[in-house]
Amino acid sequence: MTRKQRAIFEPALVRTALLDAVKKLDPRVQWRNPVMFVVYLGSGLTTLIWLAILSGQTTGSALFTGSVALWLWFTVLFANFAEALAEGRSKAQAESLRGVKKTSWAKKLSEARFDAPQEKVSADSLRKGDVVLIEAGDTVPCDGEVLEGGASVDESAITGESAPVIRESGGDFSSVTGGTRVLSDWLVVECSVNPGETFLDRMIAMVEGAKRRKTPNEVALTILLVALTIVFLLATATLYPFSVFSVEANQAGSPVTITVLVALLVCLIPTTIGGLLSAIGVAGMSRMLGANVIATSGRAVEAAGDVDVLLLDKTGTITLGNRQASEFLPAPGVTEQQLADAAQLSSLADETPEGRSIVVLAKQRFNLRERDLHSLNATFVPFSAQTRMSGVNVQDRMIRKGAVDAIRRHVESNQGHFPRAVEDAVESVARTGGTPLVVADGPRVLGVVALKDIVKGGIKERFAELRKMGIKTVMITGDNRLTAAAIAAEAGVDDFLAEATPEAKLALIRQYQAEGRLVAMTGDGTNDAPALAQADVAVAMNSGTQAAKEAGNMVDLDSNPTKLIEVVHIGKQMLMTRGSLTTFSIANDVAKYFAIIPAAFAATYPQLNALNVMQLHSPASAILSAVIFNALIIVFLIPLALKGVSYKAMSAAALLRRNLWIYGLGGLLVPFVGIKLIDLVLAALIMS
């Protein structure tokens, strides 16, 4: 799901942004943006010159100088307004999150069990390691891990999703978030953070962006903009002595004024992108939140735009994720009912969809009823990422089910033999895109349970789009190579990693990074944490464990693994917006040359009148028109900076050509039209 997006120019936000824009005139704020700080200084200088003219201390046109000074201040204010508007949208989102935080009470337990003695304490007094009981109707007082129990939890205040979710001890759905509400049953939870460090607190801090640091690309672009500003500053500074010399040599005209030089400098330096750069970064974070993804920093959003390798879990991302048992394929000498009986026993305590489907299929085929593990005096062996199998120990039987290679190792370690007929059955299931689970009883292989999964509709087309963009897709699965190859071919991914372990994921990420590539992945379990920490873009599922959320640099509140593709799109859109507006900003300097250079020097060098291709009314109106256009273009581009440029899936070279045509050519032509229209308005005002 996505959050409802606020209108860009919502009246309440605009009022707040206007006030903040004035507050940002503080020099301590302005110097952080070097390009706009030059405009800020130029505004102050022309204002002083205007005051000097009014007081008779110097000569010049008070109307012209005052008008230039006024529009230079507007340029600074418009840039401040763009940044304040972007920040205001983020702050409004943060306020809605802050409303989730309520003063609540907690039932603190003396021990980690349901019937332990309890005391009522303030949620703010809870510390990491404290254990609390949360019952139906209670607000979850802290972030933590479920130690005991299971409950239905309303997380709509955090995720925006109205459907309740199940949180229970063990597995990858054991994490609870402070501020959510338990709807039924009960949970015993161990707090995993101290006050002020909760997920909600971190969300608010991230969204507000109070301590937003510039990303590497922003820093690099800022250095480029500063370099251009210095070049234009030096070039403009040399024009004054050149003008004085030219007037004396030609005995014509008058030296160019400081006001005109300041106007020329401001129009030539990249004020458009300089004024919008910060707003673009803030808006990128805001758009990510609009997709219900919390990014820990702008660096993470930017990295998403540079990603060229996506590691995608098969289950839930590429396939629907609800694999169902469809067939029992017994080994030689084993009846189908014997295999079904053992498979059902091994799955009685397995709460996964696959495990439950095995129990149901055995019941449907052979009327095998569920049995109680306690009455059988059996011990359940849970699945782990390392062993890649689960099962049950009952009496003298050691029943295991799991991946082919895992069961093979288990059987051979017990001096058993893996039958060729079972290998053939495994290959048969795998070739059709199914997942074979092998069942063994000690050293004896009993047969194969076939699991069927379905590839999501439209996923192949999405992968084709990513391929056009130069992004490699890699499917990660615990299935054997044959199954993985069949599903990979059906889904259209570029590569796959079969029989994946946490160590294999980590090694694959490091391999791609060693090749200079940026890697993105999703994860929700504690076993995913090392790989999430290593990946350049790591999207942790909100439903996952605390360890996974701490290891990732983004959290998907919807817990939808497919969201990784949308995250990459948002990141690329932010980078494209920044690049497009930089191209536009630099390109529109050309028209300003044709406006200001003839106006400033035509009196001394009449030949320069040939450059007045726009036939502007007068030197004063030409200069003022360029300054006004330079200010207004920032306002007109604010929606584009906040929403992002339109994005289409294509190669980097094709995108570059497209943007050069739209924003490069547009940057050349739009100022000619804009400056001419403003000049016509000024001329009409002068004539009236």
UniProtKB/Swiss-Prot annotation:
Stretches that traverse the bilayer: 34-54, 62-82, 219-239, 260-280, 594-614, 622-642, 667-687
EC number(s) given by UniProt: 7.2.2.6
Keyword Repeat attributed: no
A single cellular component GO annotation: plasma membrane
Keyword Nucleus: no
InterPro entries associated with the record: ATPase_P-typ_cyto_dom_N, ATPase_P-typ_P_site, ATPase_P-typ_TM_dom_sf, ATPase_P-typ_transduc_dom_A_sf, HAD-like_sf, HAD_sf, P-type_ATPase_bsu_IA, P_typ_ATPase
Keywords: ATP-binding, Cell inner membrane, Cell membrane, Ion transport, Magnesium, Membrane, Metal-binding, Nucleotide-binding, Phosphoprotein, Potassium, Potassium transport, Translocase, Transmembrane, Transmembrane helix, Transport
Catalyzed reactions: K(+)(out) + ATP + H2O = K(+)(in) + ADP + phosphate + H(+)
Binding site for Mg(2+): D524, D528
Subcellular localization: Cell inner membrane
Annotated positions binding ATP: D350, E354, F383, S384, A385, Q386, T387, R388, M389, S390, K401
Any Pfam family the entry gives: E1-E2_ATPase
Membrane topology reported for the UniProt record: Multi-pass membrane protein
Active site per database record: D313 (4-aspartylphosphate intermediate)
Any GO molecular function: ATP hydrolysis activity
NCBIfam families: ATPase_P-type (TIGR01494), kdpB (TIGR01497)
Job description of the protein: Part of the high-affinity ATP-driven potassium transport (or Kdp) system, which catalyzes the hydrolysis of ATP coupled with the electrogenic transport of potassium into the cytoplasm. This subunit is responsible for energy coupling to the transport system and for the release of the potassium ions to the cytoplasm.
HAMAP family referenced in this protein's UniProt entry, alphabetically: KdpB
UniProt similarity note: Belongs to the cation transport ATPase (P-type) (TC 3.A.3) family. Type IA subfamily.
Subunit note: The system is composed of three essential subunits: KdpA, KdpB and KdpC.
Protein name as catalogued: Potassium-transporting ATPase ATP-binding subunit
Organism whose genome encodes this protein: Yersinia enterocolitica serotype O:8 / biotype 1B (strain NCTC 13174 / 8081)
